[in-house]
Structures are given as structure tokens and as C-alpha cells.
Amino acid sequence: MCVGARAGGLPNVGSLLRMLCMQYVHDSEGWFSGARRCPSPNFNARPVGVDPELVVVHGISLPPGCYGSGDVEALFCNRLDPSGHPYYAQLDGLRVSAHFFIERSGALTQFISCDDRAWHAGVSQWRWRTDCNDFSIGIELEGVDVHGYENTQYQTLSWLLVGLFCEYPRLSIEAVVGHSDIAPGRKTDPGPAFNWALLRRLLRNKFRPGESGRPLNNSSSNR
């Protein structure tokens, strides 16, 4: 059963900490109160002693290139009808999930506790480590590689990342990567249309020295 009303992305306003406390409160079980909760059965425990150290940004739409169908949620909750679209035959029996899904409107849904291991990365490697699902948080954005993502999605993503950074000290903007970065040659999302420079700018505007104690790297890189 899914809980919480659908809502738009969070506003980009004022004090980071006050807004964070009101909007994205991380509870003792790894769920964020600012997200609609829709538990997926597709998860398992992280290895003992392993906390999130990486955030993987994905892009997804079902059917491909179509938005607002509700079928991404159906896929993550094992309710996708394989006869609903010709593309879905290849997804029959697939068991995948992400911790979060951000719709085109900016609405945020959480499927898996951040304390648990979602099944989003597949065969993957980051730096010297494999099996990125073990130590990562997966965030799916509704979209395709070559279509620009919505400003509301960037706003919600940036606020969510701020909340994650506050909860998990090993996370930082340098540890936010695309699926294509950890599975090159196998995955291409979130694709060339994803604006990494905009995401960095939004995060720098929220995390300022003296406010968080962890200022972001002011690199001018597009990544």
C-alpha cells in the first residue's frame, strides 16, 4: 500500500536547515517524510557495517518516452502488466527497484528504506568497488536520455540530496554519479540531456560554508 499524497517538488527557498526539518525528515527506519511512501518488495539488507557512500542517478520512463503512466511504480512493485505495451514483454518477471522516483512534476516517491539495499545498479563498479547496490542510493528520474529533465525534478533532486548528505556523512556531490558512470557500455542514463552543472549550482546554493559545515567543491566542471 502506498502512503502519502502526491505533491510537486519542493520550493527553493531560504534557510536550508529549517526547510529540511520541515520537508525531508529521515526517520529511524530510513524513510523520508517528504516523500510519498510506496514500499517495494524488491530489496535486501546491505552488508553488515555498510552505509551509503554513493548516489546513482538514473533515468526511466514506461513505456519509453511516455510520462505519467504510473507504470514505473508498477514495475518497482511487481505489478506491471506485460500485456500492457509491446515493450513490457521483455520486463516480465524482472525484479528491480530504486530508493526514490522523481516524476516530471517533481513529485517524489520512496520505494525502499535508505538503510536497505535497492536493486537498481546491476553489474557495476565505482572506483575500485563492485556491486554498487551494496553501498549506494538509487534515484530514478522520469525521463529519457535525450529529452531535457524538468526544473521541478532538479529542485526535488537537490533538496533530496541535501537531506541525504545530512543523514549520511560519507555522501557528497563528488559521490553523485550517473548510472552510465558505474556501468559504462551497458547503461547510458540519465543521458546527455541531464544538466549536471545545474544540479551542482542548486546544491551550492543550499550548502554554503557555515550553514552545513561541509561546503561543496566549487569546481566549474559540468560533472
What does each model-identified segment do?
Residues 22-33, 130, 135, 144-223:
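Basic/polar, cationic surfaces and motifs that engage anionic cell-wall
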Residues 139:
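Conserved, mostly hydrophobic/aromatic
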